[in-house]
Amino acid sequence: MVGQLQGGQAAGQQQQQQQATQQQQHSKQQQQQQQQQQQQLQLKQHQQQQQDILYQQHNEAIAIARGLQAATPADIGDNQPYYDTSGNVDWERAMGAGGAGAYGGIGIGSLPAAGGAAYHLGPANPAGLVSRHLDYGDGGHLAGPSAGLPAGAVGSGAGAGAGAGASVTGSGSGAGTGTGTGAGSGSGSGAAGKEVRYAPFPVASPTHSIPTTSQQIVGSVGGVGVGGASSQSISGGVPTHSQSNTTGALQRTHSRSMSSIPPPEPFMIAQSKAVNSRVSINVGGVRHEVLWRTLERLPHTRLGRLRECTTHEAIVELCDDYSLADNEYFFDRHPKSFSSILNFYRTGKLHIVDEMCVLAFSDDLEYWGVDELYLESCCQHKYHQRKENVHEEMRKEAESLRQRDEEEFGEGKFSEYQKYLWELLEKPNTSFAARVIAVISILFIVLSTIALTLNTLPQLQHIDNGTPQDNPQLAMVEAVCITWFTLEYILRFSASPDKWKFFKGGLNIIDLLAILPYFVSLFLLETNKNATDQFQDVRRVVQVFRIMRILRVLKLARHSTGLQSLGFTLRNSYKELGLLMLFLAMGVLIFSSLAYFAEKDEKDTKFVSIPEAFWWAGITMTTVGYGDICPTTALGKVIGTVCCICGVLVVALPIPIIVNNFAEFYKNQMRREKALKRREALDRAKREGSIVSFHHINLKDAFAKSMDLIDVIVDTGKQTNVVHPKGKRQSTPNIGRQTLDVQSAPGHNLSQTDGNSTEGESTSGRNPATTGTGCYKNYDHVANLRNSNLHNRRGSSSEQDAVPPYSFDNPNARQTSMMAMESYRREQQALLQQQQQQQQQMLQMQQIQQKAPNGNGGATGGGVANNLAMVAASSAATAVATATNASNASNTAPGSEGAEGGGDGDGGGVDDDNLSQAKGLPIQMMITPGEVAELRRQVALENLQNQRMDNLEQDVPVEFECCFCTTKGLPGCHGECIPLRANSV
């Protein structure tokens, strides 16, 4: 037993020793791996530093060495510096008055040559070329950089170099000598393939974007020796040049918005407007030139807003096409009214164009953003009167179309037949068959009227027992006509959509009166044929109905607009007709009495009484004058003359009103018929595919007005902290650049806006929007230069001289990006979950405080503060650093109690008020450059899906740039600012 125990103990000890040995070996392996990783990291850092130095030396050496060949005849002597897209001097194209010789003046520690305005590389460097970074350098590198003598030493040297380029386009080699201060010699080899982008004007607002090659440098660069102040020579290997087929930034200035050429960069647009004091406005092919400052007089108009646009997207929202090379903006509009509108910018006086339709002129005023209230007094009355008349005509036309559209026949096969029959009998213009039926109906009306007239001729009458009777043949013709009228009336009544409306219609009543006397007469004659005593009375009644047959001629009013207008005039001019009858009655009474007393004493006078004189007075006042009765005395003739003159005046007074009513109704009827014909023609053309309907004459403007997305304004006027509303301001860190403090608490306006919010206006009542972390419009145009060595070479632009933010109502606001509604919906769900988590955290905190003993208050308070900091960090990404600092402060606070560490803001924690203020903020999301295309696609899809045309009053486009905080791996580069399209509210 003892041996077994000893053996077991020995085995256990051996196993423990093996485990300890394995642990030691494992720890050694981990240490070795860590050392290897550190060595690799140091090696990478060293290689990166060496590569950066080589990049800098390589770029400057290439710039100086190929300056002579890069110069073009147009560049030499233009006395204008050239810049790359980062806002730095492009040393390859920096021409001066001295031409290419100016490059000779650039040396180590030397001054520029006397012949030109070349750029100084900087202070003296005792070891070689001054190290400068061009910010976009991405070419090859030199295996052995040139080395020079200390500055100030006098000597001479020679440089030679040779090498083969890694680029497929070619290689280069060269040698040269130079004399002067700081001459150097050296050799090296390596590949050089560098993208160069340049613009023909200074850059005040550098904007990084996706590179586009306009000129490639290939080949190797050998040793480089830099000449001194004598400007005689530059030695070194000169690389070969090859032009690329891709489009560069210089060519982009010639691009137009509708072409396939990439749009120009925002800084190009801004500098084009800064360089040119005039601008060409092309409206419908007619060019106008105007000063930019003239357009600034009306900043809220379309041309005034065009002056402030600095991005391609903002410009194409306002115009249809443009060319920076020609300094021309094109508007696809009618040019007739633009001269008057442009004169309004110049003189401040707006006049209408008489040759134009008033509605077309009004549409042009609305398009250019000019209010019609600016019209001069000489044109105000004429403009509004003409516009009111046109609107009244359009209203009546729309009313006619509305009445036509109100005819409802229901659904189903029977309704289709009913509608077809109604249009066939009631609307002759709808089809050829309807016109044929209308012609047949007119022929029957005329035939019936002729038969009625011929029946009165004695030669055609039939004598029965000494009593004249109707001709049997003409009676048969009349019977056929009455049968047609009866059938037509029954079919029209059965097909009408509204029976009661049809029955009380004026024309339908005439149709009924045209056929009813025939059947009444026929019925009376047949029923009283044997009653001899009553037959004579029946014949008198029949004669009355026979007289009513003449009303058949009024059936022509259904097919004649003039007859309908006459009936409308008589119906709507009853007041004027009554006034006319009153005037005539008074005149007849007065002049008949005077004529009676003047003529009663004459022998064989016809004025035997006043009623007998009414006839004479009536025909005299109406200027008819039959002559059957006339005065014979001198006084009677004077009375007759005065009666005639008064009759002319009395009759002429109400006649113009009656005539106007007739003309108005006739014009309305003709307009209604034309409107129906035009609408039917358009419907027929649409069915046949001859035309395509559209909603707005300017499709681009319609698309701009249909955009309804979300944008965010960060007002820099009020600097209030998100989590510390008491005034403890803390900035939010960002990747590679310093961001703004996000506003909250009282007065913050980090919320949805329509682009018209004024400064300090709170729009928190609307739905909050989403923005990317650090995605804002930063107008600090010297941000890149502060971290660049070239900052010492050129003067930096101040923030006051930079391009101002684009906002009409709030110029101090900085516009940031927008997101789609789907992102907002997801954020609302996330906010709801966060609020629930906050409530749970608060409940847990209360439970912990109740259960925790008094002695452990400090530790408990620190834990609660940590929880609260986590909640605050999940509520708003911009408050991450603040909440973390608060939690650290509460953890390190000695002797703090649980209540103080958990809820008191003095200890660095987050209180309930801060939480309630923080949870209303939106979630900040990070946007990477790879998501730009997807973001633009979502924005375009939402624009097409919304297609809102109801918000036409707001027409102010909102511009912004979204700065995506990424890195290119090169020093001095802090991301890309890519312009996106915003809503045109």
Curated annotation (Swiss-Prot):
* Its membrane topology: Multi-pass membrane protein
Query: What is the UniProt domain comment for this protein?
Result: The N-terminus may be important in determining the rate of inactivation of the channel while the tail may play a role in modulation of channel activity and/or targeting of the channel to specific subcellular compartments.
Provide the family line. Belongs to the potassium channel family. B (Shab) (TC 1.A.1.2) subfamily. Shab sub-subfamily.
Further information: The segment S4 is probably the voltage-sensor and is characterized by a series of positively charged amino acids at every third position.
Q: What is its main location?
A: membrane
* Protein name from the UniProt record: Potassium voltage-gated channel protein Shab
Q: Where in the cell is it found?
A: Membrane
Gene Ontology molecular function: delayed rectifier potassium channel activity; potassium channel regulator activity; voltage-gated potassium channel activity
- A Pfam family cross-referenced in the UniProt record is BTB_2
Where is the stretch described as Disordered? 1-42, 160-192, 230-260, 721-775, 789-813, 886-916
Q: What is the source species?
A: Drosophila melanogaster
- The residues that cross the membrane are 436-454, 474-495, 506-527, 536-561, 577-598, 638-659
